[in-house]
Amino acid sequence: MSAEASGPAAAAAPSLEAPKPSGLEPGPAAYGLKPLTPNSKYVKLNVGGSLHYTTLRTLTGQDTMLKAMFSGRVEVLTDAGGWVLIDRSGRHFGTILNYLRDGSVPLPESTRELGELLGEARYYLVQGLIEDCQLALQQKRETLSPLCLIPMVTSPREEQQLLASTSKPVVKLLHNRSNNKYSYTSTSDDNLLKNIELFDKLALRFHGRLLFLKDVLGDEICCWSFYGQGRKIAEVCCTSIVYATEKKQTKVEFPEARIFEETLNILIYETPRGPDPALLEATGGAAGAGGAGRGEDEENREHRVRRIHVRRHITHDERPHGQQIVFKD
């Protein structure tokens, strides 16, 4: 006799199937983000930790990426505090906002900062600012060297201040045609212009390494002076008096080779510690005396100025008895 089970059905056994994965990342709600209030006129922006509070009108006034974000084309989410998060450096975002608000901004002087601002302008698609940054960078690249500025000495005090304020060697040209008491020789005007032209050429070539000064108020007619570490090292005077048969004349020379030599010699004073004594000796410097004479007169030799004068023509009757003509001391 078979017995048939009766009663309520047995409880269903637990399912052995694994739960199906949803395949979706956690939604914005999981991070506490919510849509931007559609009717709001103001927006709070958190750009890489830099906080900004601005209006929708500013953000949507120009055709940029920010206009695409806040004109309703895409959904913009905010955090619990109502801040819109933008994962970007906020260093130049204030400049971006100012450009969107005003249409122009002062650009940074640094080439590096200009490049950074250009990168941000490209990211936010601010076309006008992109063009301004590119133009500024191009102008900086075209400026190959700094301006060649030549101070004009107006007083001995100003000259001393200029010499004390620079660490560069100094080349000074004094030219003052009004100092002449006599007529000039036929070649003097031409030679004076040659001295001025050579000074300008040297200034254009060496203005990055030397300070060039012009003096138009001094007592000489044409004289070059060379300074190193605040003191005069050499001097080349280009004028002399020619005694003709019946009248005196002023003669201006153009000792081009000597001027070039002294200009190159003064370059050894570029280093703060001064020139090497062996180098001074090789170039005929003031400290370049022989080893036997490097005793008690060493300091005097180091501070002696090389003065080179052009030949001075003197008649026999006007030369005092026993006077010798000295061309270099």
Swiss-Prot record:
Residues 1-22 have a biased composition (Low complexity). PROSITE patterns: BTB (PS50097). The keyword Nucleus applies. Pfam families: BTB_2. It is found in: Nucleus. One of its GO terms (cellular component) is Cul3-RING ubiquitin ligase complex. Gene3D superfamilies: Potassium Channel Kv1.1, Chain A. InterPro entries: BACURD1-3, BTB/POZ_dom, SKP1/BTB/POZ_sf, T1-type_BTB. Pathway: Protein modification; protein ubiquitination. Substrate-specific adapter of a BCR (BTB-CUL3-RBX1) E3 ubiquitin-protein ligase complex required for synaptic transmission. The BCR(KCTD13) E3 ubiquitin ligase complex mediates the ubiquitination of RHOA, leading to its degradation by the proteasome Degradation of RHOA regulates the actin cytoskeleton and promotes synaptic transmission. Homotetramer; forms a two-fold symmetric tetramer in solution. Interacts with CUL3; interaction is direct and forms a 5:5 heterodecamer. Component of the BCR(KCTD13) E3 ubiquitin ligase complex, at least composed of CUL3, KCTD13/BACURD1 and RBX1. Interacts with RHOA; with a preference for RhoA-GDP. Interacts with POLD2 and PCNA. Interacts with SPRTN. This is BTB/POZ domain-containing adapter for CUL3-mediated RhoA degradation protein 1. It comes from Homo sapiens.
